[in-house]
Amino acid sequence: NFKLTGRYTTDHFSAAFVSPLYDINKQNWSDELNDNIVDLEKLPELVWTDEIIGNITKTASNETGLAEGTIVTSGTIDAAAEAISVGVIGTGDMMMMYGSTMFYILVTDKVLSDKRLWYSPWLFKGEHSSMGGLATSGTLTHWFKNNFAQELTGDDTFIRLAQEAEKSPPGSKGIVFLPYFSGERTPIHDTNAKGTFFGLDLTHNRADMYRSIFEGIAYGTNHVIDVYK
């Protein structure tokens, strides 16, 4: 924002991720903590995501090709922007984002105070968000492919693995998979948690193991949803 407009800003949603430097109750920088860490005037100005913060400067226009004077809004971090793109706008709307990790955003009309989840003001003044996430998802399928399906190549590698997994029955013939291969985020908040395949025996094959990964991620998602309930 500074390079585009000459104004230092960040939105409330992003700032909440550096709580307690950001006071979520006051929706402002924390006077008490920042006095001992950084001068408040050195922190970016807090704005709401949809606020117009300025216009493209002549310098920025020359460097980017964007028209001088173009209006610039605050913007926000990737996950929140993705939530907006799929229609998560008002109270009760929720996004489940599948990627290298899992991320969940639920828009609420009040602060949901639960230490098992994350909280941030939502993108628009007067709204709030409750969030959760798994530390691994797509990273697990890549790990599995790289270690157990190296002979599969090409753009359809993961389609072929998924087709194999479909041949395994629900429950993966008794395999229970814990997806804690990079610790875990919500709701257990344990960086030391470890991933595990439970119940393996000589009757199992690659399809069963791969299906159990899908099911483990699904159970992890359900673990978060149970907290919301």
Which positions does each model-derived feature cover?
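Core alpha/beta catalytic barrel or barrel-like domain that forms the active/cofactor pocket
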Residues: 45-51
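Active-site core segments that coordinate phosphate-bearing ligands/cofactors
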Residues: 1-37, 51-229
